[in-house]
Structure formats: structure tokens, C-alpha cells
Amino acid sequence: MSQQEVCPLNLFQSAQGTGRVCMRVCVCERGRELAVLYRAAMGNAQKKGPGYREGGGPNSQPGTPGRRRSHGLNNAANSKEVPGSSPAANGSLPAGKSQDEPQGPGSAGESCNLDAPCGALPPPLARLKNQGNMLFKNGQFGDALEKYTQAIDGCIEAGIDSPEDLCVLYSNRAACFLKDGNSADCIQDCTRALELHPFSLKPLLRRAMAYESLERYRKAYVDYKTVLQIDISVQAAHDSVHRITKMLIEQDGPDWREKLPEIPAVPLSAQQHRKEEPSAELLQARAERAEQEKARKAEARFTILKQEGNELVKNSQFQGASEKYSECLAIKPNECAIYTNRALCFLKLERFAEAKQDCDSALQMEPKNKKAFYRRALAHKGLKDYLSASTDLQEVLQLDPNVQEAEQELEMVTNLLRESLLANAQG
């Protein structure tokens, strides 16, 4: 391979210190790695859109009879199957294998019916196409290219009006060119295939890879983005867009998008994996499930916070406990017990006004809550409102006469109230 030729399959690895993509790697040294990358990239484009065999559309322009035969990677020895690699090396279908597309190398043991019909092609041309597929499958890319070229030339010379079959032939030959490192001819054949069948995924993906190998990053970016409009699940296109974006930012600066060619809008009819609009019932069911899941998570979080707060109270860490209870109330603002728990923390921290406020909130929810009355009485006591404290303690004893703490506090508060009244009278 001369230095002017582009490496048939690119490692797409950044060169040290340059940020540039290394596009020329010797096949004899890195053949295995290159083959793995190509299979990984093309193996993602496995499905065709409904109702076509990568064909359709207007007739193409005349081909190029007498196209030279390529001799880069034209035999199985130069393209050995890599263990564990995808069988869809060129983007062929792994299931329901079609003879419209060549299968990846490494499956030579499979039988191939060379006389199988191929669309509207007459038997001699169908046989050429099937032979090309078999040769490609065996890794003989140069020989496969010659068969596809003969089939293309035969279609043109015979005036066969079968754009579907001609599109696939161009796409298959483009796969050979890409395998053989001939990126320029790959681009040319992919463009012809796309003229026959616009927005055909495999020619777009192959052309994008060829553009990238030639460091024509803007055009590669456009083709990869078009591929993702057709089929969002093509991971190779996602990876390539991410990689090329970095290259374009380095090459063109922050305004790199303004220098891109226009990205075509793919019609809905050409898009794969499109999701149907969900029904109103389905949307409602989803919303209900989401709400239930949200409530479940909130309840679990509430329980954890409450337990953490209780543990902190046991360890006399009242500031931390009050914060945990505050988080609880953010989740469930109508939980009476949390207000009384936080009121206890505020009492210990001598934040009497806040303690009283929490007890007020608790009593609004539970008007006969003994803890709320008792702790509010202590808050009143801390605020030196002995009369209100006495009133709340009497409420506690009316609800439960056996609360000894309330009796003791009532006696203490009564004495404080008496002393306060005497002091005021003397003053």
C-alpha cells in the first residue's frame, strides 16, 4: 500500500500530543485490530427499514464499466476472522440472512445457493451477485468486488430497470472498497446507492466511515448524524459523532457547527425504531406508577430520617436530631409526632419560641395530644409565661391524671407564677 492510499480500516485513535486522528496504519502490522473495529462499527447497522431490500428510487447514472480490480485485501488470508468478533462485519443481517447483502467473512462453511433468485435480476446477473456475496463472506474482497462490478455493468448494458437491485449492488461493492482501503471509490458507490434509495442506512454508514478515513470530518459528521436520524440505536454512529465533534472543535473552534454542511431531515417513512404515540390510558397508567414509586421512595426516606433523628436524641445530639426531623417534615408535613419530637429538641436547645410553634402545629392536627400540651407548657415556662404554662399542664392532667411529671411541673409553675405576681405587685 502506498502512502497516498488510506488505511482500509481505521483505528480511530488519537495521536499523542496532536489531537489528530491517526488515519494511516499499516494493515500488515495492525490487521487484526482494524478488522475488529470495522466489524464493531458495521455490526450495529443490522436492520433494514420495512418493505425494502436497500433499494428503490430512480434509476442511477451509468456505472463505470471496466473499473479496475482492487488488490488490497482480496483474499481470506489477509482478513482472518477475529475470535469473538461480530459476524455482521459489513453491516449484514444476522438473522433472516438475505442474499442482497454479503455476509461477513469467517462463515465459509455455510452453503450458498449461487442460483438463488435476486429480485428482478435475470439469472446470470443474480448468479454474479451471489458469487460476490460468497466471496465477500470468505474474505476475498477483491474478487467479490469484481463480481459486483460485472453485475452492475450487466444491469446497465441490459437496460434493466431495477433500482432496488442496483442500489444493493453499489452498496455491496462499496463495502468491498471500504474493506480494501479504497475510500474514494467507496464514497462514490455509496453516493450512487443513495441516489437510488435516499436515506439507506448502510451506504450512509459506509460513506461516513470512508469520509472519516480521509479526514473529511464535516461530511462524516453529517452522514453519522443522518444515520442516527434513521436508527438511533446504531452505537457506532454515536461513538463516531462524539469522536468527530472533538476533532471539529479543535479544527474549527467554537463556531464549528456553522461550518458544517446542512444535515438533511430524514422523513418519518425512512426512520427505524420509531415509537408510536402512547394512548391516554397508557400515559395515565405511567403517571400513576410514577407517583406510586415516588411515594414509596419518599416513605422509605422518611422512615430512615426519623430513625436517625431518634438515635441522635438518645445520644443527646439535639441539633442534629432537629435537622433530621426538619427533613422528615419536608417529606410529610402533616406528621404530628415529628412536630412533638422536634419540639423536644428545641426545648433542649432552649429555643422556646420554636418549640411552642411546633406544639401549636401538633395540636392543630391532634387537639388532645398530651405530649404537645406538656411540651408547650415547658416552652411557656421557658418564655416565663407561667399562666399559659399552668393552663397547658392542667389540660394534660385532665387528659391523664396519672402523669406525675405534669403534676410536678404544675406545682413548680404555680410557685413561679405566685412569685411573679408578688414581684409585679411590689414593683
Swiss-Prot record:
SUPFAM superfamilies in UniProt: TPR-like
UniProt region (Disordered), positions on chain: 46-113
One GO-annotated biological process of the protein: axonemal dynein complex assembly
Described function: May play a role in the cytoplasmic assembly and/or trafficking of the axonemal dynein arms.
Keyword Oxidoreductase assigned: no
Entry GO terms, CC: cytoplasm; cytosol; dynein axonemal particle
Disruption outcome: Morpholino knockdown of the protein causes increase incidence of dorsal curvature and hydrocephalus.
Compartment(s): Cytoplasm; Dynein axonemal particle
Keywords: Cytoplasm, Repeat, TPR repeat
InterPro entries per the UniProt record, alphabetical: CiliaryAsmbly_MitoImport (IPR051982), TPR-like_helical_dom_sf (IPR011990), TPR_rpt (IPR019734)
Protein's name according to its UniProt entry: Sperm-associated antigen 1A
Superkingdom of origin organism: Eukaryota
UniProt repeat feature TPR, residue ranges: 125-158, 167-200, 202-234, 302-335, 336-369, 371-403
Keyword field contains DNA repair: no
Organism: Danio rerio
